[in-house]
Each structure stands twice: as C-alpha cells, then as structure tokens.
Amino acid sequence: MAKKSLIQREKKRQKLEQKYHLIRRSSKKEISKVRSLSDKWEIYGKLQSPPRNSAPTRLHRRCFSTGRPRANYRDFGLSGHILREMVHACLLPGATRSSW
C-alpha cells in the first residue's frame, strides 16, 4: 500500500493540472501562430510561469486498490499483481487466465 501522503500529492497534482490546463494550451497555440523569435521567447516565459506540478507529465496513474504507481493496466486501473490476484479469484468479469 502506498503512503497516503503520496496519494494526496498525486491528487494535488491532478487539481493543479486541471487548473492550469487552459493556460498551457492557449500559450502553446500562441507559440505556433507567432512568427518572430523574440515574441516566442516571451510566450515561452509565460509557459514556464505556472507551477511545475501543473505539468501533465508529472502525473502518474495509480492502482485503485493499493496506490502503486508502476505496472498499471489502463483498462482495469489496477497494478499487475492485484490484477492477477483478482483474475485468479474470478472477481473481474470477462478476464480470463491465459493457458497454452
């Protein structure tokens, strides 16, 4: 189980990303429209002004049950070992174990 502080930190990052999403998107559109290099550098400065944790690359997917940030399956929202346990216990409908 992940520490609760790490899970809360991730939630805070998600809120920040949603808050500054429109600002980042509008700045990137402006950069593509502007031709002069000096204006582009000015807009790049604006793009760096939001907090670093508001960048979408800082977000991690976490397992719903354990909060683990690695080996997550997008379809289920679970980490690999929890997914395997749930499939073996027949708790996920439609998921079958592979055998060959």
Swiss-Prot record:
List where in the cell it is found: Plastid, Chloroplast
Keyword field contains RNA-binding:
yes
Concerning InterPro entries, the annotation shows: Ribosomal_uS14, Ribosomal_uS14_bac/plastid, Ribosomal_uS14_CS
Q: Does the keyword Nucleotidyltransferase apply?
A: no
Q: Which UniProt keywords apply?
A: Chloroplast, Plastid, Ribonucleoprotein, Ribosomal protein, RNA-binding, rRNA-binding
Coiled-coil region list: none
PROSITE patterns referenced in this protein's UniProt entry, alphabetically = RIBOSOMAL_S14 (PS00527)
Gene3D superfamilies given in the database record: 1.10.287.1480
Can you provide one Gene Ontology molecular function annotated for this UniProt record?
A: structural constituent of ribosome
Q: Which GO terms describe its cellular component?
A: chloroplast; ribonucleoprotein complex; ribosome
Instruction: Name its GO BP terms in alphabetical order.
Output: translation
Q: How does it assemble?
A: Part of the 30S ribosomal subunit.
Function, please?
Binds 16S rRNA, required for the assembly of 30S particles.
Family affiliation: Belongs to the universal ribosomal protein uS14 family.
Q: Which HAMAP family match?
A: Ribosomal_uS14_1 (MF_00537)
**What protein does this entry describe?**
Small ribosomal subunit protein uS14c
- Organism, as annotated: Lactuca sativa (Garden lettuce)
Q: What is the lineage of its organism?
A: Eukaryota, Viridiplantae, Streptophyta, Embryophyta, Tracheophyta
